[in-house]
Amino acid sequence: ALGCDLILASDAASMSPPIQRGVVPESGGTWLLPRLIGWHKACEVAMLGEKLRADDLLRLGLVNRVVPAEEFPDALREWAAQLARQAPLAMRATKRTMRLGLDTTFDANAHHVMAEFYGLTRTKDFAEGVAAFVEKREPQYEGR
């Protein structure tokens, strides 16, 4: 789950570090965890092996939001609907430039951002976004 862009958790969620099973964090866990929460907290989570409850995961920044278990399906649908309303090309470019920014300098990332920005201004979605803003209505993006 650490590799997900957004993580919604129910208040019944928990995580047990892999060290409790005699293995290392797999699926990029050893690469991601220190980048997400810092070296010392990552060592605490990965090495002490304490079970983390939903509120612990939220406090550490490993999940975006915790909702009551009975509200989880509705909250998940709302997030999906909110994401679906966004401009898909801009969503892809945002994710790409944010990921690049993790491993590049500020100047290199700024170059990538401006290239993406320029490319997006030539799309139908950009024109739709501007028109919707001017007309004070919700945009209807097509991913073009």
Predicted regions, residues:
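Helical "substrate-binding/catalytic lid" subdomain
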Residues: 85, 105-106
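A short structural micro-motif
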Residues: 100-101, 136-140
